[in-house]
Amino acid sequence: MKNLYLPITIDHIARVEGKGGVEIIIGDDGVKEVKLNIIEGPRFFEAITIGKKLEEALAIYPRICSFCSAAHKLTALEAAEKAVGFVPREEIQALREVLYIGDMIESHALHLYLLVLPDYRGYSSPLKMVNEYKREIEIALKLKNLGTWMMDILGSRAIHQENAVLGGFGKLPEKSVLEKMKAELREALPLAEYTFELFAKLEQYSEVEGPITHLAVKPRGDAYGIYGDYIKASDGEEFPSEKYRDYIKEFVVEHSFAKHSHYKGRPFMVGAISRVINNADLLYGKAKELYEANKDLLKGTNPFANNLAQALEIVYFIERAIDLLDEALAKWPIKPRDEVEIKDGFGVSTTEAPRGILVYALKVENGRVSYADIITPTAFNLAMMEEHVRMMAEKHYNDDPERLKILAEMVVRAYDPCISCSVHVVRL
């Protein structure tokens, strides 16, 4: 007798950035195939910057994404500065990291409260939660607005941050504004701690429990952070950022406009939980206390732990931003910018965007970009994400199809994908 196949299709995954769907094919004896369909068209950001002046290209790259434009701006800037042989002063680097932290706080708060929490409270939209969960929505918006304000102050706008330029910043705010930023961060710390306690109570579905290889940037210095020159894997491997192509292989899959990535021939994960797994020993302050008390919930074997790891990071990055502001203010007044000589060269920057490792590789010749390669966290995560959707489907394929759809979407949302970022073409 011929086997019968039942397709379960999610045409559009709700509450994620970009356009993607899931297709689960179920046969007589279980799940036959799972496809994470990325239907966002390639956007050619690398290709369109070839031949552009370096400064012009640096204004284009943040347009890849409004969710994480600061991450794109600052990673591209570092790659460009490495290419031309320029090293920014410590106080400039500290303020750039504060700008980046604004992106972290905004992105994590939006993801946790507005994209993830509705699933756990039985709502299809955060707007429908307002009456019953007014406090949670208010906290979400306060944290989100704090991150947005930080980016606006240091980047001169909430998205695309044109004030971050080669050599430093176009201008810097008054000292009193940065002092106010410290005060606002201190006021937000209890909200971040509440967020962690809230998400520590949410279920991490055991259906997707299993071994995961985690990759994260190894931070410079002795603090858990965003910038680094090496990539660290949970299998003990470390390699220089410049050798990312030797260890991480991208490949085309038929059902997706975004390529998949493997490390040592296998899917892997990046993101907040990957940072915690690889770099938890560098946490400090209240975040360190929360981590030590909740290690069993911050496991590297479950993608749902990524939600709690993001909540932990909101606590940590608030404290870290205060410390970085203190470092910069100790050297006040600060010259905003140094002159940069545009020389020929090649530079690679790996930073930790909210969703995981972000890679920029830029080659500069005669003041123009001659090569660009950008790999985003979601492009790294797609293969592992698809594997976890399969694991969930294998446990629930006999359930009501609508229930399976919800669980499959929850798996995807746990990764906090930015689908628009994940499609890229290096050469036309």
UniProtKB/Swiss-Prot annotation:
Q: Which PROSITE patterns match?
A: NI_HGENASE_L_2 (PS00508)
* EC number from the UniProt entry: 1.12.1.3
Database matches in InterPro entries = Ni-dep_hyd_lsu, Ni-dep_hyd_lsu_Ni_BS, NiFe-Hase_large, sulfhyd_HydA
Disulfide topology: none
List the PANTHER family hit by this protein, alphabetically.
Answer: COENZYME F420 HYDROGENASE, SUBUNIT ALPHA, CYTOSOLIC NIFE-HYDROGENASE, ALPHA SUBUNIT
Q: Which UniProt keywords apply?
A: Cytoplasm, Iron, Metal-binding, NADP, Nickel, Oxidoreductase
Q: What is stated about pH in the biophysicochemical properties? A: Optimum pH is 8 for hydrogenase activity at >95 degrees Celsius.
Cofactor(s) named in the record: Ni(2+); Fe cation
What quaternary structure, including any partners, is listed in this protein's UniProt entry? Heterotetramer of alpha, beta, gamma and delta subunits. The nickel-containing alpha and delta subunits constitute the hydrogenase activity. The beta and gamma subunits (flavin-containing dimer) constitute the sulfur reductase activity.
Gene field: hydA
**Domain of life the protein comes from:** Archaea
Mind telling me what this protein is named?
Answer: Sulfhydrogenase 1 subunit alpha
Residue sites binding Ni(2+) per the record: 65, 68, 418, 421
Reply yes or no: does the keyword Iron apply: yes
The free-text function statement in the UniProt record for this protein reads: Part of a bifunctional enzyme complex that functions as an NADPH-dependent hydrogen-evolving hydrogenase with sulfur-reducing activity. May play a role in hydrogen cycling during fermentative growth. Activity not exhibited with NAD. The alpha and delta subunits form the hydrogenase component that catalyzes the reduction of protons to evolve hydrogen.
Protein's organism: Pyrococcus furiosus (strain ATCC 43587 / DSM 3638 / JCM 8422 / Vc1)
Temperature optimum or stability note: Optimum temperature is greater than 95 degrees Celsius for hydrogenase activity. Stable up to 100 degrees Celsius. Loses 50% of activity at 80 degrees Celsius after 21 hour incubation.
- Where is it located? Cytoplasm
Q: How is the cofactor bound?
A: Binds 1 nickel ion per heterotetramer.
